[in-house]
Amino acid sequence: MSYLQDDKPVTLFEIGKMRAEGRKISMLTCYDASFASLLERAGVDILLVGDSLGNVVQGQKSTLPVTLEHMIYHTECVVRGSTRPFIVTDMPFGAYHESPSQAMHNAASLLAAGAQMVKLEGGTFMAETVRFLVERGIPVCAHIGLTPQSVHQLGGYRVQGRSEAAAAQLKGDALALEQAGAALMVMEMVPAALAREVTASLASMATIGIGAGPDCDGQVLVLHDMIGVYPGKKARFVRNFMTGKTDIDEAVASYVQAVRDGSFPAAEHCY
């Protein structure tokens, strides 16, 4: 179960305390009330209402077609099914890129739907928007490394930060986003050694890895991936936690424990 008392909601303060005390943070994507309830029972700390629903729920080839209305609807569903986990919702493509004011308007809609934090993709160039939101009372989770909304610009789903220049850019991005007020940051498909350096360089912003090695402050996976419900080739960073389990509750509890004790991700899941 969770580090917290079963009936005690996970808050941003508690997440910061977990980071400070070296207790790993577990996050999974979630898109509906039934799974929200299941993930809560298994002790997941953070539910990410991810725009990955475009891939695993809608059958899209990318997250780009997902709309703000989709994210509001799925956030409302997740909120109805859970009471304890902290809820983070992705801002979809096009919902925050035009201006900080546009981001504020759309982030407010997501918080009204029940989200407790919004997540947006991008590095230093998004720092102004992050600061604008945080100064107006909207908690922000940043996302660097492989940013799926930029899949066409990046030339596909590739590991980021391999070159010296790219690594320096990611380090600079992380510091700029922390200084702008982001409280959490997802690092996706980043070499484990680089993710470790970035995490160590930050004063208080908690890092959540996906394909970013074991030294982040926490881990996240797409729910459908970690229970083996995915089409095509499995990504290197994915582990099927249903293997050897009799039900999904047991698989999710196993994921939470593996994140907590540091056995996931293992070397074979890292770059």
Curated annotation (Swiss-Prot):
Catalyzed chemical reaction(s): 3-methyl-2-oxobutanoate + (6R)-5,10-methylene-5,6,7,8-tetrahydrofolate + H2O = 2-dehydropantoate + (6S)-5,6,7,8-tetrahydrofolate
Q: Which key words tag this protein in UniProt? A: Cytoplasm, Magnesium, Metal-binding, Pantothenate biosynthesis, Transferase
Q: Where does Mg(2+) bind?
A: D51, D90, E121
Q: Name one Pfam family in it.
A: Pantoate_transf
Keyword Transport listed? The answer is no
Listed under GO cellular component are: cytoplasm
Sites binding 3-methyl-2-oxobutanoate sit at: D51, S52, D90, K119
Q: How is its cofactor bound, per UniProt?
A: Binds 1 Mg(2+) ion per subunit.
Q: Does the keyword Cytoplasm apply?
A: yes
Q: Which residues form the active site?
A: E188 (proton acceptor)
Output the CDD domains linked to this UniProt entry: KPHMT-like
E.C. number, please? 2.1.2.11
- Which cofactors does this gene product need? Mg(2+)
Superkingdom in the source lineage: Bacteria
What does the similarity note say? Answer: Belongs to the PanB family.
| Subunit comment | Homodecamer; pentamer of dimers.
Name under which the protein is recorded? 3-methyl-2-oxobutanoate hydroxymethyltransferase
Q: Which organism is it from?
A: Aromatoleum aromaticum (strain DSM 19018 / LMG 30748 / EbN1)
Gene coding for it: panB
